[in-house]
Swiss-Prot record:
<dbReference type="GO" id="GO:0009507">
    <property type="term" value="C:chloroplast"/>
</dbReference>
<dbReference type="GO" id="GO:0006412">
    <property type="term" value="P:translation"/>
</dbReference>
<dbReference type="Pfam" id="PF16320">
    <property type="entry name" value="Ribosomal_L12_N"/>
</dbReference>
<dbReference type="Pfam" id="PF00542">
    <property type="entry name" value="Ribosomal_L12"/>
</dbReference>
<comment type="similarity">
    <text>Belongs to the bacterial ribosomal protein bL12 family.</text>
</comment>
<dbReference type="InterPro" id="IPR036235">
    <property type="entry name" value="Ribosomal_bL12_oligo_N_sf"/>
</dbReference>
<dbReference type="InterPro" id="IPR008932">
    <property type="entry name" value="Ribosomal_bL12_oligo"/>
</dbReference>
<keyword id="KW-0687">Ribonucleoprotein</keyword>
<keyword id="KW-0689">Ribosomal protein</keyword>
<comment type="function">
    <text>Forms part of the ribosomal stalk which helps the ribosome interact with GTP-bound translation factors. Is thus essential for accurate translation.</text>
</comment>
<dbReference type="GO" id="GO:0003729">
    <property type="term" value="F:mRNA binding"/>
</dbReference>
<dbReference type="InterPro" id="IPR000206">
    <property type="entry name" value="Ribosomal_bL12"/>
</dbReference>
<dbReference type="InterPro" id="IPR013823">
    <property type="entry name" value="Ribosomal_bL12_C"/>
</dbReference>
<dbReference type="GO" id="GO:0003735">
    <property type="term" value="F:structural constituent of ribosome"/>
</dbReference>
<protein>
    <recommendedName>
        <fullName>Large ribosomal subunit protein bL12c</fullName>
    </recommendedName>
</protein>
<dbReference type="GO" id="GO:0022625">
    <property type="term" value="C:cytosolic large ribosomal subunit"/>
</dbReference>
<dbReference type="InterPro" id="IPR014719">
    <property type="entry name" value="Ribosomal_bL12_C/ClpS-like"/>
</dbReference>
Length: 130
């Protein structure tokens, strides 16, 4: 059982991309399809992680903040927040808030997007990050 333990320990050290490549090589070498194998209860999260493709391992770097819904009773508070974030004038911000869904900020970092989302949600609006 020592060989198996060694192999398992080495697999634990692999990155997600390396684990994905390992799964592909095992499938090719042994002519099996891992996606058809039913995981044993308790191990499913570990097996699912190793089956992810390299595309799913990519981290999104740029985010868009989209104002989705503005409740009428929260409009003034949301208008103030939108003005402070966008730098729009009063008239432009009013038109912006009344024409949802609208992109508030585009291609920003995840941290900035989360901060803006929190500000707008605190004012009472619905926001989506994409």
């Amino acid at each position: 059982m020592d060989k198996i333990d060694e192999i398992v320990e080495k697999i634990k050290l692999l990155s997600l991309l390396e684990a994905s490549e390992l799964v592909k090589r095992i499938e090719d070498t042994f002519q099996v399809n891992v996606s058809n194998i039913q995981p044993v209860t308790g191990l499913s999260s570990n097996l699912t992680t190793t089956q992810q493709t390299p595309e799913s391992a990519e981290v999104k770097e740029k985010w868009d903040v989209i104002l989705e819904n503005v409740p009428a009773d929260k409009k003034i508070a949301i208008l103030k927040v939108v003005r402070s974030i966008t730098g729009l004038g009063l008239k432009e911000a009013k038109e912006f808030v009344e024409s949802v869904p609208k992109i508030i900020k585009q291609s920003i970092s995840q941290a900035d997007a989360e901060h803006i989302k929190q500000q707008i949600e605190d004012a009472g609006a619905s926001v989506v990050l994409k």
